[in-house]
Amino acid sequence: EDGVLLSMTRGANSQVAWAQHETDGSDRFLSIASVPSTDEDAVVVAVRRGASVYLERMSSRQPQLEVDLYSCVESALRYEGAPTDTFTGLSHLNGRYVWVTARNSPPYGPLLVSGGQVTTPEEVGANYQAAGDEDETTLVAYIGLAYVGELELLDAARQRLEQKAVTRVGFEVDSAVGLEAGQDLEHLVPWRQRTVADSYLYPGAANDVVQVYVKGAWRQHGRAALRQSKPLPVTILGVTRELEMGEM
């Protein structure tokens, strides 16, 4: 009734996890269906945006091309062409704030859609052409509504009665750009993905095992949290935490 979409993930050992998905502002999910297609069963939702109802297909998180990893926006338009600072065809998002995402480029937003188009502060895609990236001959960009991904671990089961402080959060990621970690969603530290050997291009999607050092307060539950606050790709394969133990 509240328009929030629910999803369930079931592991091979019958473990079950639930998640909820909220869309932009006062928009509401109305219904959901699984539609057989050539390569996979597509997830299609009916969503009310303002006075209109749209059918939207959720993008696969196993895209064939790396450029399509950046389809991390809702109700999106896919642009393919020369580097540009103006994107049109967005009349369905007039009056909304959108983001523009592309490989090797920082995400641009929030940007107000007016007259069915949006303009970025600079040309998207010009940076990697200036760097001589021969793999990039055409810009592929996505323009749409951003969403935030949040994950929080359960209480540390061991020694429940002792005080715990989270000192380090470790996670394994696949095709990830940008992430924050901490003792909770109010105290997060960014994953510093760039190194001194990097070019000036925006960091690309990485497959890595990462450790983020945090300064957690003493608490009884010993939880940890992750957040992806920008519309950038991330697949989390595993999460762990390091705790200091103390007496109550």
Residues covered by each model-derived region:
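Beta-sheet repeat architectures centered on beta-propellers
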Residues: 1-248
